[in-house]
C-alpha cells in the first residue's frame, strides 16, 4: 500500500513540478513594462473587437394593414446579423389581393467585406499578440540578443497599426450603410404594397445597433494601442541604438572642437 501511495504522489507531483518550472522561467516583470503591458491590452481589445462585431444580430420590421381593417394587419420581422449579406435575407411581403397571399422579398446591400475584414484582423491580432507575449515572457533572452526579433516585431506592429485604421474606418462606413438598409422606413419603401391605396404601412421593430457601434469604437482603440506601441517596439530595435550613438558622437565632436581651438590659441600666445 505504501509503495502504491508513494508512486501516486510522485505522479501527482511531476505535472505540478513541470508547471512550476514553466512559471518560474517566465519573466513577469515584462508585463510591468510598456512593451508587455500594451501587448496585454492589445490582446484583450482584439477579443472585444472581433467578438462584438462577429456576434451581432438584430431585427427590423414593418406593419402592413390591408384595406384599413385592423383584422388584416400583418407583422413583418426580419432578422439579420454578421456577416451582413443583407441581399440574401428573405422576408414575406403580404399582398392585399385575392390572387396570392405573399411575395418573397430580400433586403438590399452586401456589407460583408468590411465586416469580415474587421473580424479577421481582430483574430490575427489576437494570435499575434498572444505569440508575442509568449516570446516576451518565456524567451526574453532570445528577443534581446537576436536583433531580428525586434525588427520583425516593429514591422508587424506598424503593419497592424495601418490595417486597424483602415479596418475601423471601413467598418464604420459599412455600419452606417447597414443602418440605412435596415431601417423600417427602408423596408416599407422597398415593398410595392406600401405604395398603393390597398394597404397602409407603418414602421415596426427598430434594430438596436449598440453592440455594432461599440465594435467600431473597439476598432479605433486598437488602432491607438498599436500606434502607441510602435515607439516602445522601436526602442528595442538596433535602429534606435544607432540613432543614439550618432547623437553621442556629434556631441563629443562638438565638445572637442572648442577645446582644440582654445589649446591652439594658448600655444600661439606662448610662442609670442
Swiss-Prot record:
GO cellular component: synaptic vesicle membrane
Annotated region described as Disordered, given as residue ranges: 240-272
Domain MARVEL per the UniProt entry, residue ranges: 30-238
Physiological role: Involved in communication between the T-tubular and junctional sarcoplasmic reticulum (SR) membranes.
Subcellular localization, as worded in the UniProt entry: Membrane
Highest taxon above the source species: Eukaryota
Gene: SYPL2
UniProt xrefs under InterPro entries: Marvel, Synaptophysin/porin
Ranges per topology, Cytoplasmic: 1-33, 138-150, 235-272
Family named by the database record: Belongs to the synaptophysin/synaptobrevin family.
Carbohydrate attachment residues: 213
Species annotation: Homo sapiens
Bilayer-spanning residue ranges: 34-54, 117-137, 151-171, 214-234
GO BP annotations listed: heart development; intracellular calcium ion homeostasis; substantia nigra development; T-tubule organization
Main location as per UniProt: membrane
Name by which UniProt lists this protein: Synaptophysin-like protein 2
Vesicular side: 55-116, 172-213
Keywords, in A-Z order: Glycoprotein, Membrane, Transmembrane, Transmembrane helix
Membrane-protein topology: Multi-pass membrane protein
